[in-house]
């Protein structure tokens, strides 16, 4: 039996030898038969310990040793439970966003009115320094002709004196 249980790699070592082909075929047949017999006799290696079967295991062990309490025969599962620490309630913080606020909280920012600008004709005239007689000038707009404007407004004392002085000069 010791001859049969030689090194399992010897099969491959004999395969590469340079002996005659007849002896190789007979050696190969013997090796394959021996390998089949060995496989049928030992399905698992004998060197490793076998695990006990389920029936045998449950007959010998009823519960783990760390749970055994000789004073109380029942297992206190509540004392074994591990709970996560409770987190404190989170405070609500308003997120800072660039989003448009809802309509009820939206207040239109009042913008200042743009400064009164010059007429573009006057502005361009100043840019190009076109200050001739026909250049536009910034004067008060006149809606009524001069004659009607004088009739509507009562003449002041200064205007009456000037008008009287001009009449005297003309004569």
Swiss-Prot record:
Residues 1-56, 126-171 are annotated as: Disordered. Signal peptide: none annotated. InterPro entries: DUF4660. This is UPF0690 protein C1orf52 homolog A. It comes from Xenopus laevis. Residues 47-56 have a biased composition (Basic and acidic residues). It comes from the Eukaryota. Belongs to the UPF0690 family. Pfam families: DUF4660. Residues 146-160 have a biased composition (Acidic residues).
């Amino acid at each position: 039996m010791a001859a049969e249980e030689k090194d399992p790699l010897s099969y491959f070592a004999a395969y590469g030898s340079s002996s005659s082909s007849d002896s190789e075929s007979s050696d190969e047949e013997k090796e394959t038969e021996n390998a089949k017999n060995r496989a049928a006799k030992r399905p698992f290696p004998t060197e490793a310990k076998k695990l006990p079967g389920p029936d045998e295991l449950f007959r010998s062990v009823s519960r783990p040793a760390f749970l055994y309490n000789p004073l109380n025969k029942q297992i206190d599962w509540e004392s074994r439970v591990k709970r996560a620490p409770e987190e404190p309630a989170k405070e609500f913080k308003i997120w800072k966003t660039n989003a448009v606020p809802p309509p009820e909280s939206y207040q239109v920012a009042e913008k200042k009115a743009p400064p009164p600008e010059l007429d573009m004709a006057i502005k361009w005239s100043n840019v190009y320094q076109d200050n001739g007689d026909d250049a536009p000038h910034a004067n008060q707009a006149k809606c009524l002709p001069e004659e009607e404007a004088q009739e509507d407004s009562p003449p002041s004392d200064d205007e009456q004196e000037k008008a009287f002085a001009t009449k005297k000069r003309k004569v």
